Amino acid sequence: MEHRKLIKANEVLRRCAISRATLYRLISKKCFPNQVSVTGSRSVAWREDEVQKWINERPYSK
């Protein structure tokens, strides 16, 4: 079984340099990687590789 590293919302916000509101706006528009439920807790996380891919492919605005 392949294990991927998961990162929590605060780390996603830091790496992407976006606000929590922007994160959830992107999620609602289906413009951000899917979140996954963390087994044994009520929290969610994101797959690190998918977030990094999104960052790498994100167009930069000036």
Where are these predicted regions, by residue range?
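Short helix-start
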Residues: 7-9, 34-58
